[in-house]
């Protein structure tokens, strides 16, 4: 058997459905994961439209307690901008990138070392702001989402793969590679972008657990995956 695959499970937007439906399943299988949070309480904005039904965490004391508990259990919390709008990001990347890091760190008392580009929109100005803000790694998205454990990586434009309904882990996992996979809505289109049902998410995690238990896969946070590749 060659090197096991590394798999980093990531979740964008801080949607409540992720915490209510995905986290209990992740806990059941003892999988760490990375959650990229938007640093405000407004509805999610996508392509210029508001989606008030896509309920985000609202940074209440209850939510902060929930997130701190997840951190203690090995989850990673990363940043995903302040306003989740490309015009604001292009106009003031320093505020969007640095502000989201400061918001998370001040409330959760933990380092936010990872950033996720909203809509996978990466420009040199935004990338520079991410580096200057002190992040250690960030991911965009070109839908390949895997790296050989020994190939060079642009740590400030790491690729990822959006997971869709009815996908099987066996269709994309490869030994000796680091896979960064992304989830948004867990449920229906009323819950978030590109949703998969709770049943499908559970089935995918059950399949991933079989790979993990066989020694073929190690599930790690995004920052831990980056750390391991830097050492390889």
Locate the predicted segments by residue.
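C-terminal domain-boundary segment and adjacent tail
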Residues: 1, 28, 33, 105, ...
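Boundary/entry segment of secreted carbohydrate-active catalytic domains
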Residues: 3-17
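Metal-dependent polysaccharide deacetylase catalytic core of the NodB/CE4 family, i.e.
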Residues: 6-7, 27-126, 145-147, 151-153, ...
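Aromatic- and glycine-enriched glycan-recognition loops and surfaces
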Residues: 13-17, 55-67, 197-202
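Aromatic/hydrophobic pocket-lining residues that form the small-molecule binding cavity
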Residues: 19, 63, 93, 97, ...
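His/Asp/Glu-enriched short active-site or ligand-binding loop at hydrolase and phosphoryl-transfer sites
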Residues: 111, 121-168, 220
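C-terminal anion-handling pockets and recognition modules
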Residues: 172-177
């Amino acid at each position: 058997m060659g090197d096991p695959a590394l798999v980093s499970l990531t979740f964008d937007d801080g949607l409540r459905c992720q915490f209510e439906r995905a986290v209990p399943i992740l806990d059941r299988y003892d999988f760490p994961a990375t959650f990229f949070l938007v640093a405000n309480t407004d509805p999610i904005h996508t392509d210029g439209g508001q989606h008030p039904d896509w309920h985000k965490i609202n940074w209440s004391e209850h939510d902060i307690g929930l997130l701190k508990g997840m951190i203690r259990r090995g989850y990673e919390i990363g940043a995903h901008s302040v306003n989740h709008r490309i015009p604001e990001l292009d106009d003031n990347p320093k505020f969007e990138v640095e502000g989201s890091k400061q918001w998370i760190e001040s409330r959760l008392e933990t380092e936010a070392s990872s950033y996720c580009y909203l809509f996978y929109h990466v420009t040199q100005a935004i990338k520079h702001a991410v580096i200057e803000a002190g992040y250690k790694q960030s991911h965009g998205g070109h839908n390949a989402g895997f790296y050989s454990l020994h190939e060079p990586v642009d740590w400030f434009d790491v690729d990822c793969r959006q997971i869709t309904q009815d996908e099987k882990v066996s269709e994309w996992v490869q030994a000796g590679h680091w896979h960064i996979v992304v989830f948004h809505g867990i449920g229906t289109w009323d819950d978030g972008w590109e949703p998969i049902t709770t049943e499908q998410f559970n089935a995918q995690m059950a399949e991933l657990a079989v790979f993990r238990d066989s020694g073929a896969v190690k599930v790690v946070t995004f920052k831990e995956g980056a750390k391991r590749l830097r050492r390889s």
